[in-house]
């Protein structure tokens, strides 16, 4: 059974959502603050985390940082704040999606399913083998990436994005192609999400992220991974 960890201090939102998730066949656990979320994750794990940005005490961004240090578990940020900077910060920390309150519980469950589908894609074209491009080596089956022999940690979306780029090394991929492949054709949003993930990837695979030579921008088109 797919487990969902709900980190939300508003019981009026968390409890009905947990009830609906259970009706839909998920295992749902609710915690109301950051330390409890980390303790529960360490105790039982989770297949996906719904994380409120505005938590009492330890913020959602700090919780996301701690989760990313532990795991590549998918994270959907949930918040009442609709500021673009909030979204960018959440995505830079490794969140896989971002939902603004008030939201439809059914819509949120659809997003959960979409994120889990993308994370569990078993298409053989995109799921097996060892890929190499320049200093980057990816073992797709083991979900391990190394740069110049040093292992790096990538959240799920960064891993998926890098895998698609590596499978198309030397080829220009448009922003639309990348978003459709990594976030899905039902993704609603702009290209800033992609650009944030590219920036994060560059910080991990480039010797000088400000002057990339491997993951390069093709002006007016998209991105290309050079071998």
From Swiss-Prot:
GO biological process annotation, one example: regulation of phosphate metabolic process
Activity regulation field: Phosphorylation by SenX3 stimulates binding to the target promoters. Activation of the SenX3-RegX3 two-component system is inhibited by PhoY1 and PhoY2 when phosphate is readily available. Overexpression of the kinase domain of PknB (PknB-KDMtb) inhibits the transcriptional activity of RegX3 by phosphorylating Thr-100, Thr-191 and Thr-217. Phosphorylation at Thr-191 and Thr-217 abolishes the DNA-binding ability of RegX3 and phosphorylation at Thr-100 likely prevents RegX3 from being activated through conformational changes induced by SenX3-mediated phosphorylation.
The keyword Ribosomal protein belongs to this UniProt entry's keyword annotation: no
UniProt effect for mutating residue 217 to E: Slightly reduces phosphorylation by PknB. Inactivates transcriptional activity. Significantly reduces the binding affinity of RegX3 for its target DNA sequence
Family annotation (Pfam families): Response_reg, Trans_reg_C
Any one GO molecular function term: transcription cis-regulatory region binding
One GO location term (cellular component): cytosol
Modification after translation: Phosphorylated by SenX3. Phosphorylated and inhibited by PknB.
Subunit structure as annotated in this protein's UniProt entry: Homodimer in active state. In solution, exists as both a monomer and a dimer in a concentration-dependent equilibrium.
Cross-referenced CDD domains: REC_OmpR_RegX3-like, trans_reg_C
Record-given protein name: Sensory transduction protein RegX3
Phosphothreonine: residues carrying this PTM: 100, 191, 217
Gene source species: Mycobacterium tuberculosis (strain ATCC 25618 / H37Rv)
Function: Member of the two-component regulatory system SenX3/RegX3 involved in stress response. The system is involved in phosphate starvation response. Plays a role in modulating expression of aerobic response and in the regulation of response to hypoxia. Involved in virulence. Regulates dozens of genes, directly or indirectly. Is directly involved in the regulation of the expression of gltA, cydAB and ald. Binds to the upstream regions of the hypoxia-associated genes Rv3334, whiB7, Rv0195, Rv0196 and Rv1960c.
Effect of residue 52 to N: Cannot complement the deletion mutant
The keyword NAD belongs to this UniProt entry's keyword annotation: no
InterPro entries found in the cross-reference section: CheY-like_superfamily, OmpR/PhoB-type_DNA-bd, Sig_transdc_resp-reg_C-effctor, Sig_transdc_resp-reg_receiver, WalR-like, WH-like_DNA-bd_sf
DNA-binding region, residues: 128-227
SUPFAM superfamilies tied to this protein: C-terminal effector domain of the bipartite response regulators, CheY-like
